[in-house]
Amino acid sequence: MCKLLLHLSCLICFTVMQHKYTVRLRSGFAELWRYNIVAECGGFDAAGERVCFVSAQSVIAPVGSALRQAPSEPTHPRAITMTTEPCESITAYIYVIPNTLPVSREVQDCLPFGLKVSVTADGETVYDVTHKVNQWGGASIELKLPAPAPQHAGEIRQL
């Protein structure tokens, strides 16, 4: 007696979802004037090809300026925002670069400060973290964020 086994094949189909990502950087650190902030962000399609590039910066003074006090223009608090074109995922690089080192040489006087990094995709928060920034060395932050999962992961079709 022979048995015939029937195998069902399924194909999962996903709708390609593109989102406008908004990256926001903010810090309330009183001495943030001692730092330049540079941010770059590439948006990628489902195949990993870059489809857009945005950047923003807030430069107070050239590196090595050794400023003795904050500039006369208000620099506190500082915020940077950049928004991509529609894309599947992003890779962002954030650099916090000292232009003036701390006056004190004592570690306890120069504790890390916070830089809040938040990312939304079409208004939905997908990343919200406060990073610690070393007062002497600054920070380099890399973010690789895929698009948020759709409400319905996909539909299953029988072949």
Identify the residue ranges that each predicted region occupies.
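Short, surface-exposed binding/anchoring microloops in extracellular/periplasmic proteins
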Residues: 17-54
